[in-house]
């Protein structure tokens, strides 16, 4: 659900544009009731009354299809097969934050700790919390170490990539030959931009079967992770993520099984995921977004007063000749 203040603000708009069908469903489906304190009867209802339209976040296909920079640091990784996670590590206990970052690490370690050390894949964590400071980096590192500590020497490799990367650097990360698949246990996305960008690699994506990313991740080309809708935990709640809300929690056993299958049968999953690239190039590019935006503006601009240009008189035209008057 969305906060009531958000509803009040939205109703001051003429048109509300959101990035996904999921976001639209949440916005139009949220309502607050005002009841008579004595009778308990509903006397008023607050919900969005203005039109809500969906406009996806188009991907720059020129940058994310053809990276012009190389992240040479990744060449040094000991593991040739690596899962990639991209997202903020926000507030919340392990298993309760919005991106479910801690459980991505724990599930990965649980699955691959049984393989011989030279056969284990790695996990690249492109993550941070509030910023990109040294303090933030060390805090993230401590969180990762805390999750891996119980696994001891059996823990597979987890790499932290911390810092602000440009679009070209992110594209280089996605396309690097040592990045084999992307994984996300997200509890809820308005859109899921890193997932959209990664589709242009044509590599496998494992992602929660819920929320905004479903718009551009066709089931036939994606490894969708099962789960269920659960309550927001107190440790993750704030003024935007309300305690009264619900979101998605991945079935970790299902996720573990599918992560292993992608690793163990990679070539078949690579064939399956090739359609992700075609789908984004055809339906979710910046150019396609522009087309949809123009259609939307044409639809809602009808009846809106148009600017009328002010036309100055042509001063170069022949001046009118006035008659000459005789002096008296």
Give the predicted meaning of each segment.
Residues 1-16:
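Membrane-proximal helix-turn-helix segments that form the acceptor-binding/catalytic region
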Residues 61-169:
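Conserved catalytic-core segment of nucleotide-activated headgroup transferases in glycan assembly
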Residues 172-190, 200-203:
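Acidic donor-binding loop of glycosyltransferase active sites
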Residues 129, 238-328:
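C-terminal amphipathic helix plus adjacent low-complexity
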């Amino acid at each position: 659900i969305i906060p009531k203040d958000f509803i009040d603000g939205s109703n001051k708009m003429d048109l509300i544009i959101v990035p996904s069908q999921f976001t639209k469903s949440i916005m139009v489906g949220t309502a607050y009731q005002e009841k008579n304190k004595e009778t308990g009867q509903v006397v008023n209802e607050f919900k969005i009354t203005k039109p809500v339209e969906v406009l996806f976040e188009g991907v720059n296909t020129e940058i994310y299809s053809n990276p012009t920079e190389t992240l040479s640091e990744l060449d040094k990784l000991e593991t040739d097969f690596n899962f990639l996670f991209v997202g903020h590590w926000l507030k919340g206990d392990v298993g309760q934050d919005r991106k479910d970052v801690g459980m991505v690490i724990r599930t990965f370690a649980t699955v691959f700790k049984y393989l011989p050390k030279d056969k284990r894949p790695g996990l690249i964590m492109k993550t941070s919390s509030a910023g990109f400071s040294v303090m933030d980096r060390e805090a993230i590192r401590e969180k990762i170490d805390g999750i891996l500590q119980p696994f001891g020497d059996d823990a597979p490799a987890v790499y932290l990539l911390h810092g602000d990367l440009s679009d070209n650097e992110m594209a280089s990360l996605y396309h690097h030959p040592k990045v084999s698949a992307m994984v996300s246990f997200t509890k809820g996305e308005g859109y899921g931009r890193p997932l959209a960008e990664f589709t242009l690699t044509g590599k496998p994506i494992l992602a929660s079967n819920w929320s905004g990313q479903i718009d551009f991740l066709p089931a036939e080309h994606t490894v969708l992770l099962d789960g269920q809708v659960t309550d927001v935990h107190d440790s993750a709640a704030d003024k935007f993520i309300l305690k009264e809300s619900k979101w998605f929690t991945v079935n970790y056993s299902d996720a573990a099984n599918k992560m292993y299958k992608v690793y163990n049968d990679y070539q078949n999953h690579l064939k399956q995921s090739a359609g992700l690239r075609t789908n984004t190039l055809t339906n979710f590019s910046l150019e396609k977004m522009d087309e949809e935006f123009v259609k939307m503006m044409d639809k809602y601009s009808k009846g809106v007063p148009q600017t009328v240009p002010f036309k100055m008189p042509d001063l170069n035209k022949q001046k009118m000749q006035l008659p000459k008057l005789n002096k008296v």
